[in-house]
């Protein structure tokens, strides 16, 4: 609390409580009950009677925030029963008794033991009583009184927030409310101006002002622009005592932001933009970006781009990038340098959310000129059509021209073009094409029935730049000609009952034709000219591409004729007329009365061959026995043990011993065909190799095709040069094994062979075991020791 404000407060208290305050400070007070008459005693002992304002004795007043060194005097309690002899004792109870307030039990003087704060508690209720020390009885009934704490201006105003945040739209008029700030003062508002707060602005002029009583902050300047300044800091002061000098004050800070309104149109930073584009770019390609600047923010800065006019409005398009607010120039139609090299566009940028309040400022859009230069590139040939359809009769001769494709070079240089057929689409090489003019011709005969359609691809390539090529599909439809005769649609197993009657239908036949005439099939049936009048059966044309076979006589006999062959002439109505003869086999069968077949001519056929059932069984048994004998003979021959040629591994008599065994090398099993040296179409087949040595694997080189009339010597020299120039070949000093001839000999060298100096050291008896051919040699070296002596 601030102590320098006590003197004015004392003066104010003196004005309202003149007499009471003087008497309280000069003489002791006596506390009387409501039945007594309160009074004051002076030094001369005379009683001053008071009949008015007796209630003042029921309350005391005390200033807060006392800073003196002694205890603060509150007042004095006194009763008429007190004779001054010390027999009475004053007792104080209630709020703060004994701690905040103490009483002299002999004199009744009350003092404040501590400094008091009205803001903490402004009113204390206490009770006082006087008792006789000797008897302990109350000489006066207990009575209640009040101590009120008088306020002093010891609290400055405080705002509800230390920092306020507010916003106001830019371009607002003067007096637009922004925010209201509020400050409170803890002092007593009922006494004086200690709690009367007045607001003023310390920082923020001349942009803002504050209402001194309500604390409402308002705009003070018109048309403040966010683009010029967006943030403002305003300091507001609240001062008590009605703003008079000596009042306490507090401050707060208000951060005010100007919010954006759409008061600025978009503007291009430059009036002309230049872009380049190759003529071969695909549709939808982004050529470049343009951007108009808008100082507004948020949705107020959103804009949309459009092509207003220009000679390329149908060739290009502009797309708005919502994230970057840029206009993207894209290709809408295919470009052609030869047709037009430069396009000029006018592109508009306009706000999508204009504010009607600011439309008077002008149109919220801007226009820029975009120039697009088309760059010439070497383009591939272009066919005059996207695809070709060729129709050709299937009987066209080989080498005949059936159609033509045409391509041109769109470049200004107009390079020459050659045509070819993609053989991946014509594996059988049925068609060819003249490379100069694109005429397509046949290389083989055509057959609609095997392949009615052929889909090939023709390539057009620039002669000067083979990398530039185009492809076009060519659909070749083979048209049908009447080159197939009609024939039976299926194999018919026809029978006739022995008890059949004349005119009975025994079979209906239909035919098929591999041809496909445009007007549909129409077939006719007739007997063959050699048998125009058949005594057994009649052919009836049903006029619906079918024919019925009718019996012509009464009854048939299996014994006389078990099978009839009926030739039928079938022909169509297309040009040229094709015909064929189909023979229908009709068996004679035994049937019941309803015409159901019971048995047919199988037995009759067997009997007609002159073989009975027993004979057939005998033949089958003989064949079976013969097969068994052959199998047994083969099994015995495989089980026969061969006689060993050499009984002992050391016996080499009468045997051929091969010493030049070259096994272990490449496991080639086929000899080299020298005939391929003179075959220009020869190719080396890649074989799997399992080389033993060397272990280094080199890249396989393809054989260069040989032309005719090159002899073997030239070929070998040519291959030798290729091998010498091959970078993948091993160096000259590397070890190359061409023929692996087995392991080394047991003998290290010829020096290991030595002659025996004594015949006694050699035993030649084994020569006699070598057979008759070595008998003479055995006799010469295998004699007894006595003979040798």
From Swiss-Prot:
Q: Look up and give the membrane topology term.
A: Single-pass type I membrane protein
Residues that the record marks as modified (Phosphoserine) are: 786
Q: In Gene Ontology terms, what is one molecular function of this protein?
A: calcium ion binding
Q: Which residues lie on this side of the membrane: Cytoplasmic?
A: 637-789
Q: Which SMART domains match?
A: CA (SM00112)
The reply on keyword Calcium is yes
Spell out where the chain crosses the membrane: 616-636
Query: Can you say where in the cell this protein is located?
Result: Cell membrane
Q: Where is the Cadherin domain?
A: 54-159, 160-268, 269-383, 384-486, 487-608
| Propeptide segments, given as residue ranges | 22-53
- Cleaved signal peptide residues: 1-21
Under the heading PANTHER family, the entry gives:
CADHERIN-23 (PTHR24027), CADHERIN-9 (PTHR24027:SF99)
- Share the domain note from the entry: Three calcium ions are usually bound at the interface of each cadherin domain and rigidify the connections, imparting a strong curvature to the full-length ectodomain.
What name does the UniProt record give this protein? Cadherin-9
> What organism is the protein native to?
Homo sapiens (Human)
Q: Which gene encodes it?
A: CDH9
